[in-house]
Amino acid sequence: MSSRALSAYRAALRATRISFQQDNDVLLAARKQIRDGFEASRNSDNAEEEIVKMNEISKFLVSNIVQGEKQGDGKYFLKFHDQTELGDNETIKQNHKANMGSLAGAKAKCR
């Protein structure tokens, strides 16, 4: 096992700790999934691809997964952390009108 593979594996375990802290069931399930995937690809002919994939998984977990906790009023409290990727909706707002086109004057036949 290469040091790069071991480093990618450890990074994935750290990513689960960041993403799923205080949720032991999900944390343990995520770690088991990573461990199983790592073991399955241990003797792979495409080791470099597997390392890249593991690093991408780590990055995705840390930057895109947030925990939500249901509050008494039925709303969810989202637990963002300092590495959570926060985007704005400007690109969505800009493309929305262009993609929708104009519905003004659209006619439909009713049968």
Curated annotation (Swiss-Prot):
Keywords: Chaperone, Mitochondrion, Transit peptide. The keyword Lipid biosynthesis does not apply. It is found in: Mitochondrion matrix. Residues 1-13 form a transit peptide. The keyword Chaperone applies. Its main location: mitochondrion. GO terms for cellular component: mitochondrial matrix. GO terms for molecular function: protein folding chaperone. One of its GO terms (biological process) is mitochondrial respiratory chain complex III assembly. Belongs to the complex I LYR family. MZM1 subfamily. Interacts with RIP1. Assembly factor required for Rieske Fe-S protein RIP1 incorporation into the cytochrome b-c1 (CIII) complex. Functions as a chaperone, binding to this subunit within the mitochondrial matrix and stabilizing it prior to its translocation and insertion into the late CIII dimeric intermediate within the mitochondrial inner membrane. Modulates the mitochondrial matrix zinc pool. This is Mitochondrial zinc maintenance protein 1, mitochondrial. It comes from Meyerozyma guilliermondii (strain ATCC 6260 / CBS 566 / DSM 6381 / JCM 1539 / NBRC 10279 / NRRL Y-324). The gene is MZM1.
